[in-house]
Swiss-Prot record:
Family: Belongs to the universal ribosomal protein uL30 family.
One of the GO BP terms on file: maturation of LSU-rRNA from tricistronic rRNA transcript (SSU-rRNA, 5.8S rRNA, LSU-rRNA)
Listed GO MF terms: RNA binding; structural constituent of ribosome
Gene: rpl30
Subunit record text: Part of the 50S ribosomal subunit.
Source species, domain of life: Archaea
UniProt keyword list: Ribonucleoprotein, Ribosomal protein
Name of this chain's protein: Large ribosomal subunit protein uL30
Gene3D superfamilies: 1.10.15.30, Ribosomal protein L30, ferredoxin-like fold domain
UniProt cross-references to InterPro entries, sorted A to Z: Ribo_uL30_ferredoxin-like_sf (IPR036919), Ribosomal_uL30 (IPR039699), Ribosomal_uL30_arc (IPR005997), Ribosomal_uL30_euk_arc (IPR035808), Ribosomal_uL30_ferredoxin-like (IPR016082)
GO-annotated cellular components: cytosolic large ribosomal subunit
Length: 155
């Protein structure tokens, strides 16, 4: 079983039902093209299943977590994340934090000095698949095996 998932909100804020909006807010995905890393638990899996028509997710590896933290991680004042921002936490550096996030031992919402989400840009050269369909129907939504390449093009 996976230690953690990378979750990216693909669809925007218009015409989203209240129940889905609430779930997306709990996942810290309030805007389009935001990503977060969540631990793989039974309740988070249920939340992902509930909003599968608005987000895409995949198991995350330490390399992608490291890339997200160094390039898109934000600390206090929305400044780039540095080693100094992690002082006073259980993680001496960004690499250790990335490993802990990828294995599910750490949670982004529990670390006070970093933003619990990553603001991504739209993918370079566009989406290769439909943003209106599930992954099994030639789309990008839901459990997506190719999400890591998509996220790398959005960083």
């Amino acid at each position: 079983m996976a230690g953690a998932y990378i979750v990216v909100r693909i669809k925007g804020q218009a015409d989203v039902p209240h129940w889905a909006e609430t779930t997306l807010k709990l996942l810290r995905l309030e805007k389009k093209h935001r990503a977060t890393i969540i631990q793989s638990k039974e309740n988070t899996r249920g939340m992902l299943d509930k909003v599968k028509h608005y987000v895409a997710w995949q198991e995350i590896d330490a390399g992608l977590a490291m890339e997200l933290l160094t390039k898109r991680g934000r600390g206090p004042g929305y400044k780039k994340l540095t080693e100094k921002d992690l002082e006073g936490t259980d993680y001496p550096g960004i690499k250790e934090l990335a490993d802990a996030l990828a294995t599910g031992k750490a949670s982004m919402s529990k670390i006070d000095r970093i933003k619990p989400w990553f603001a991504l840009a739209p993918p370079r050269h566009g989406f290769k698949r439909s943003t209106k369909k599930m992954y099994g129907q030639k789309g990008v939504l839901g459990a997506n095996r190719e999400l890591s390449e998509l996220v790398r093009s959005m960083i």
